[in-house]
Amino acid sequence: MLFSHPPIRLAWSSAFRSARQLPLSRPRFFSISVPRYAVDMETVDTTERLSRLRQLMKDHQVDVYIVPSEDSHQSEYIAPCDGRREFISGFSGSAGTAIVSLTKAALSTDGRYFNQASKQLDSNWVLLKRGVEGVQTWQEWTTEQAEGGKVVGVDPALITASGARSLSETLQKNGSSLKGIRPNLVDLVWGNDRPSPPREKVTVHPEKFAGKSFQDKISELRKELEKKKTAGFVISMLDEIAWLFNLRGTDIPYNPVFFSYAIITPTTAELYVDDDKLTPEVKAHLGQDVVVKPYDSIYADAEALSAARKQDAGDAAPKFLLSNKASWALSLSLGGEEQTEEVRSPIADAKAVKNDVELSGMRACHIRDGAALIEYFAWLENELVNKKTTLDEVDAADKLEQIRSKHELFAGLSFDTISSTGPNGAVIHYKPEKGSCSIIDPNAIYLCDSGAQFLDGTTDVTRTFHFGKPTELEKKAFTLVLKGMIALDSAVFPKGTSGFALDVLARQYLWQEGLDYLHGTGHGIGSYLNVHEGPMGIGTRVQYTEVPIAPGNVISNEPGFYEDGKFGIRIENVIMAREVQTPHKFGDRPWLGFEHVTMAPIGLNLIEPSLLSDSEIKWVNDYHAEVWEKTHHFFQNDERTRSWLQRETQPISK
């Protein structure tokens, strides 16, 4: 599962005798016969919705209105009740910003969703392709629409304080202004059709899985706050709260979190969550250490804290710490910049470094998850090739979930399974829908990006298979991606190295061909938490220069290759950073490397061994031997799957 950037339209020659003879520069477009696939996605008529929104904008004296994707906690994944951008635009991808003026509307998203957005947006909308040269950012488009002293409105709960300041400064240069608008105007348009907020129960995440008590975590956080000489920390990120208190929920699909806020001071711990969501077990778990308050009272309490701080010591009083991802609304309630200090959350940093119990859980859950994947791919090949069964992408995804659910400690999926055949694989965050998805073609590449939540860890894995005979082009592309994945997996680097610096390792072999993939190479992964976790990552994002890879980080390694309209390739393992022994220690500092924990075969018939070095062939063979060793015992009574696993983990050679 991955971040950012667009799929690439590639140019390859079909006139070659072997993989090594593929042209290295200025290749020509090739032509292959591609069966017809159902890739259309439903387009929503937004005319009436936009008309009603524009009337509300006039009522609130707003000329341009911004509709972000995020909720009040700046969550990447959101509950259905917070799907405002999707409701107003019709675009269902997980990332994007909608901007509506009194006469125009635009949707900005990144390259994972260009294909999807172009299909889902109706004629009312302009698609702003983020990161494409010559295309305006949503901020630039907004500023242009607001020229002449116009007012731009946004729900202050849905934009970060830093984002609001930056946009406001840009607008002011243009003679325009930014205005916080409550209630949310899209909610008013949505009306009674808007889904109700979730009311599911919160559960305790036992220490045998968490590895540390919540009291110890709060104690360590207080030590950090003491170093910063702050009055306290106001927490709004849902995964940080779940991690800190060793609690989990189901308020957001695939993310075991619950709607809440928290305030930690040197002497108090307050958790803002509605009481009816807390079971007796949760209340006993929190005990006398935590004061529970209603979820909606956070803003009033923040204002009271701000007022009390001013009254007690004025401007000389310690400031409250606030995450740089916290909302503008929360910042304003605490008194804004004068009374808050925005920083990268110390909880995010602590959460990203898994303890020994969490790391052991990650290893264990990935073995079980690997067994599920092996059973699934063996089943899928048998159905498609031997039984000639007609299966669509959703049928296959449902089967994978069914197989996963049989395994110990399974708690659900970690994201929507990307089950994609042929050209659908080039839609990087493709989401198959029953009734419109494609029938899986055994003679085309099949890309499956999936993951699960287990009580002892979170998984995320992508495998690309071909159940027929792949072309030389497909094998070449797959092998280049594999080489990059191996290079990152095998990396040794000094402590303090960032994911930004490591990113080139995964891209180098594609770059040598003048090719690239325009998404991140790796993201952090939570421990029975969000499948996308910061603050570190591997990619070209500027923020990845700020956070070095540290021992205990759990990260995805997922280079890819996408030929728009034809196929997609991605190979993804989860890797854990750890200290390694080296012959020398230049600068007398620790050196780090990675341990892979994903245990699933890499499609052998897509590998072109002649493109691999001896060390890369050894890596493939060692990896497959490890997969066999750790998973074959699951199939003692399943000869079909065991035989498939044995075949798919046999050694390769040039």
UniProtKB/Swiss-Prot annotation:
Catalytic activity of the protein: Release of any N-terminal amino acid, including proline, that is linked to proline, even from a dipeptide or tripeptide
GO CC list: cytoplasm
Parts of the chain that traverse the membrane: none
Annotated Mn(2+) 1 binding sites: D460, E558, E572
Cofactor: Mn(2+)
Residues at which Mn(2+) 2 binds: D449, D460, E572
GO molecular function: metal ion binding; metalloaminopeptidase activity
Coiled-coil intervals: none
GO BP terms: proteolysis
EC number per UniProt: 3.4.11.9
Textual note on the cofactor: Binds 2 manganese ions per subunit.
SUPFAM superfamilies: Creatinase/aminopeptidase, Creatinase/prolidase N-terminal domain
Listed InterPro entries: Creatin/AminoP/Spt16_N, Creatinase/aminopeptidase-like, Creatinase_N, Pept_M24, Pept_M24B, Peptidase_M24_C, Peptidase_M24B_aminopep-P_CS, X-Pro_aminopeptidase_P
UniProt KW keywords: Aminopeptidase, Hydrolase, Manganese, Metal-binding, Metalloprotease, Protease
Manganese listed as a keyword: yes
Family note: Belongs to the peptidase M24B family.
Function statement: Catalyzes the removal of a penultimate prolyl residue from the N-termini of peptides.
Protein name: Probable Xaa-Pro aminopeptidase P
Lineage summary: Eukaryota, Fungi, Dikarya, Ascomycota, Pezizomycotina
Gene: ampp
